[in-house]
């Protein structure tokens, strides 16, 4: 089996075309390919790829349960919790399950051994197939606030080989870090607008802090100005491809279709993107090997 290669598709904000790039890139790639939707708060890759989902696995995190007969109300558990998920009020312990990260610090800190843990469901990991693609997605339970553990569960379910196209959450917050930190390459999708440039800079700062190699895809490349291109040149960031502002792409999107199947010529753009990513990762691997 070929060595696994994870390509994360990310963006500094929502609405730039991140999922459009992810599903179309996955569709044109050859060989063993897995599409992983880690935008667990609102996964939508399935709308376009239309997988037959045949497996679902519930995911939860351990949250504290306090035995009132053993609890002395000392407050050690609340002092130990850096996430403010547990509080001691008038010697009564209150647990806020939606804030809990499941670290177990309160259990360790309790001198009376009054705290145990129970599983708190946060969502489900679903998997199946779409034509030649393996498909995995996480779906956060409605009302649940803790997405990183579910994202990690999606990552743990990935195959050990082949290419993985990882559709990351938008933005630069904790869920994004959880999704992209183990990637071999990150594609940042942006658009040539002031908002697009502002959020691209935040995304670039994030991936640089993580030490991840990356490049940029400019979506709707002919709607704005040259400031995104100027910024990428100044920062020596490779622009992998530019995608035109084509009404046919938007129409295909609105119908839930993969754009490369609906717009002649677009397949070549995404095949070029695949080739550019391969070239970048091959060069990086060669540099690592010579270090």
Would you name each region that the model predicts?
Residues 2-30:
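Walker A (P-loop) phosphate-binding motif
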Residues 32-46, 119-124:
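Short beta-strand-centered segment that lines the nucleotide-binding/catalytic pocket of NTP-utilizing
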Residues 33, 164, 186-187:
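Short, well-ordered beta-strand core segments
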Residues 39, 137-142, 146, 151-176:
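Switch II (G3) loop of P-loop NTPases
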Residues 43-62, 127-129:
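P-loop NTPase switch/communication element
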Residues 65-84, 94-113:
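Cysteine-centered iron-sulfur cluster-binding motifs in ferredoxin-type domains/subunits
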Residues 175-194, 200:
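Inter-motif core of Ras-like GTPase G domains
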Residues 206-291:
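C-terminal lobe/tail of nucleotide-utilizing enzymes
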């Amino acid at each position: 089996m070929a060595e696994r290669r994870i390509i994360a598709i990310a963006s500094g904000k929502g609405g730039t075309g991140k999922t459009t790039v992810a599903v179309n890139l996955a569709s044109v790639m050859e060989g063993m390919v897995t599409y992983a939707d880690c935008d667990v708060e609102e996964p939508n890759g399935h709308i376009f790829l239309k997988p037959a989902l045949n497996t679902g696995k519930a995911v939860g995190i351990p949250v504290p349960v306090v035995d009132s007969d053993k609890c002395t109300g000392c407050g050690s558990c609340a002092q130990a919790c850096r996430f403010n998920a547990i509080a001691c009020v008038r010697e009564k312990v209150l647990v806020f399950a939606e804030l809990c990260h499941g670290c177990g610090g309160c259990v360790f800190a309790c001198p009376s051994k009054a705290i145990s843990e129970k599983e708190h469901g946060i969502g489900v990991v679903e998997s199946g197939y779409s034509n030649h693609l393996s498909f995995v997605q996480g779906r956060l339970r409605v009302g649940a606030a803790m997405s990183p553990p579910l994202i990690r569960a999606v990552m743990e379910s990935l195959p050990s080989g082949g290419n993985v196209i990882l559709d990351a959450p938008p933005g630069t917050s904790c869920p994004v870090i959880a999704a992209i930190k183990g990637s071999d390459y990150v594609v940042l999708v942006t658009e040539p607008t002031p908002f697009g440039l502002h959020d691209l800079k935040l995304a670039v700062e994030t991936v640089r802090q993580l030490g991840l190699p990356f490049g940029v895809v400019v979506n709707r490349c002919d709607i704005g100005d040259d400031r995104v291109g100027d910024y990428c040149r100044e920062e020596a960031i490779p622009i992998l491809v530019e995608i035109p502002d084509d009404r046919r792409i938007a129409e295909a999107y609105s119908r839930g279709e993969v754009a490369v199947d609906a717009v002649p010529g677009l397949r070549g753009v995404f095949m070029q993107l695949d080739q550019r990513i391969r070239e970048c990762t091959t060069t990086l691997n060669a540099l690592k090997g010579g270090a």
